[in-house]
Amino acid sequence: MSTAPSNNRLNRQQAESFLSSLSGHYYPNSSREFISGSNKDIQVPFRRIHLSETLHQPTPGVKLPPNEPVDVYDTSSVYGDPDATIDVKAGLKKVRENWIQERHSENQQYNHGITQLAYARRGVITPEMEFIALRENMGRGHLKNPITPEFVRDEVASGRAIIPVNTHHPESEPMIIGRNFLVKVNANIGNSSVSSSIEEEVEKLVWATRWGADTVMDLSTGRNIHQTREWILRNSPVPIGTVPIYQALERVNGVAEDLSWPVFKDVLLEQAEQGVDYFTIHAGVLHDFIKLTAKRVTGIVSRGGSIMAKWCMAHQQESFLYQHFRDICKICAKYDVSLSLGDGLRPGSIADANDEAQFAELRVLGELTQIAWEYDVQVMIEGPGHVPMHKIQENMDEQLKHCHGAPFYTLGPLTTDIAPGYDHITSCIGAAMIGAFGCAMLCYVTPKEHLGLPNKEDVKQGMIAYKIAAHAADLAKGHPGAQARDDAMSKARFEFRWEDQFNLALDPVTARSYHDETLPQDSNKTAQFCSMCGPKFCSMKISHEVRQYNPDTRIDVKVKDAATEGAE
């Protein structure tokens, strides 16, 4: 007898319990702070990690100055505020409502385009752009090369960056996706015909934003797609993306050949009205490209790509997505929905990486990008997939060559095919590499990839792996301020400030639990060793002793501001 129904009921009950008792998450020794903009409506959230004093002074009798707190980018909104009252039935505060209404009155008078790209091209710095500049800098006014609102505007105007902010999703806190900004991470959630419920997907949304998701895609293919998306949007502080062809397929009872432009158009309008911030559109899958996949090991692995390929073959013509692309752009322009041009022919195995089908589609995506820009629609380009390490840079080079600087957004890529259950690791290797080469956003992969629908714990594992990859890429790019947290951690580690080490970690709970498995006593939180080396073999403790023995080896242990270092 199958246990699936009972497991599904249990998962739903657990999710309902989580949401009914939902309160802001407490990060150890952290506080939620705000940076004010030029008007009172611009309040940029961030998390401040407070640090303790240095316990073991390098020079007897000489007290070092206090360790400054570390400010970090925060996507958790009220879900990271222990003092917040949260009601998922009421939804989040509409932080952008006033900005949208003010612009609506102006646009009615002058008949201007309403997208962030349209404003940027007119030389207008929107509140969203100012918000983003403050957010990227984390209030570090002393940076050598800080991000300015004008820089944000110029990057958007050039098409090198996008601000996905549907005017019908006022709950979202503005963020930017572009190669000259912090590398962002997307988390995929969504139900299937086999598993999950609305409650579970909202739970995953909350969980993903707590662990740092910059955007979330609702890839629901099961029941209640509209209702699931509505709950997600009203409770999401981050941009929400979708693949509209999934809901369109549901409308025609799963028969790809019965899809049509009228059906798809209705879905686009419905989702845009709800507030979806970006659409993945697989308009680059052309009829002639399908035969290029015939000799692939894994064929067409994109769900949207395979659906459109089947439609093209059945009707022996180009897809309605390609034929009606300008109509799609007109809808997006009305709501400021960004386009994520899907890589329907991405490689699904190492053997298929960088093949003719993949790059043929990429060139078409570059052509579609220019068409979208004619309508002031913001665009990013989706990328692979499964790519071995030595072929990753070619993907970035080809995207820059053919897509006119539009941001690149990749799924990994996975660097080997041999590790089911660990594909969050195989893929974050490739993600870190392509992020360092200039990829703007990384789509996370969970341990369940190729195996099943991710649960809440899988979402966490995927997010942690990809926040590591994104941060490593930011360090490699020399992003202003990126190294501040690393240097604070290194200093805490050298000074045996264990509590600070836990609190500075991406996952403080796990860091603490690993330490406490062998040294749980409070006294061990000030000890000059851990269980790896013990008191006699700790290299850092010995290094302190060397400095005491030989004054010439003493150095100023005050860490230089890594924010300035990263900008040089």
UniProtKB/Swiss-Prot annotation:
The keyword Metal-binding applies. It holds the Pfam family ThiC-associated. It catalyses: 5-amino-1-(5-phospho-beta-D-ribosyl)imidazole + S-adenosyl-L-methionine = 4-amino-2-methyl-5-(phosphooxymethyl)pyrimidine + CO + 5'-deoxyadenosine + formate + L-methionine + 3 H(+). Zn(2+) binds at H386, H450. [4Fe-4S] cluster binds at C530, C533, C538. Substrate binds at N188, M217, Y246, H282, S302, R303, G304, D343, G344, L345, R346, E382, Y409. GO terms for biological process: thiamine biosynthetic process; thiamine diphosphate biosynthetic process. Its EC number is 4.1.99.17. InterPro entries: ThiC, ThiC-associated_dom, ThiC/Bza_core_dom, ThiC/BzaA/B. It is an enzyme of class 4 (lyase). Catalyzes the synthesis of the hydroxymethylpyrimidine phosphate (HMP-P) moiety of thiamine from aminoimidazole ribotide (AIR) in a radical S-adenosyl-L-methionine (SAM)-dependent reaction. This is Phosphomethylpyrimidine synthase. The lineage of its organism: Bacteria, Pseudomonadati, Pseudomonadota, Gammaproteobacteria, Alteromonadales.
